[in-house]
Design a protein with these regions (language model features):
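Short amphipathic alpha-helical signal-transduction/dimerization elements
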Residues: 34, 132-136
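Beta-alpha-beta core module
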Residues: 1-5, 9-11, 69-117
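Short amphipathic alpha-helical coupling segments at ligand-binding clamshell hinges
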Residues: 26, 49, 119-133
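Short beta-strand-to-loop elements that line the ligand-binding cleft
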Residues: 40-41, 57-69
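Secondary-structure junction motif
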Residues: 22, 34-57, 85, 121
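A bilobed periplasmic-binding-protein/Venus flytrap-type ligand-binding module shared by bacterial periplasmic
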Residues: 15-23, 109-120
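A short structural motif in glycosyltransferase catalytic domains
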Residues: 16, 64, 82-85
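Flexible hinge/capping segments at coil-to-helix
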Residues: 2-12, 16-38
Length: 137
């Protein structure tokens, strides 16, 4: 397997509905996150992400499979999630706000992983270069 770093140690944000009382905050302390109603992607292993956030294995976290389900739950049910700060001014959703997470012990990184026998074509190489440039601006 090969790993290509796309973005390293990017700041964390709390994504929540504009209707959520948290939406009025300018920032949120990292320590406060585990007190919130959280929703996460099911494909994250506990020790890889939730453990880093300080959640206990018995916390009641809503798990979803896809981005649409995640955004629907955030918009309609006052759930929140922790994500990587986007590289553009566009929000994840016009009905949500992104609140900076302060005092986090780490940022979030993104990597492209592929089998070492696979050779990316020229178009894919251009895409990877452009994506890296977006995150590094």
């Amino acid at each position: 397997m090969k790993l290509i770093p796309i973005a390293k140690s990017k700041p964390l944000i709390l994504l929540t509905s504009k209707k959520n009382p948290l939406a009025l905050r300018r920032e949120i302390e990292f320590e406060r996150i585990r007190e919130l109603r959280c929703i996460m992607y099911e494909n994250f292993k506990f020790e890889e992400w939730l453990g880093i956030l300080g959640f206990e294995d018995d916390n009641k976290i809503l798990y979803v499979f896809d981005r649409g389900g995640l955004l629907d739950a955030i918009k309609q049910s006052n759930y929140s999630t922790v994500m990587m700060k986007r590289f553009s001014d566009m929000s994840y959703s016009s009905e949500c706000v992104e609140i900076p997470v302060v005092n986090a012990p780490c940022g979030m990184s993104a990597y492209l992983m592929y089998h070492s026998a696979y050779v990316p074509n020229p178009r894919e190489k251009i895409f990877i270069r452009q994506l890296k440039a977006l995150f590094n601006d």
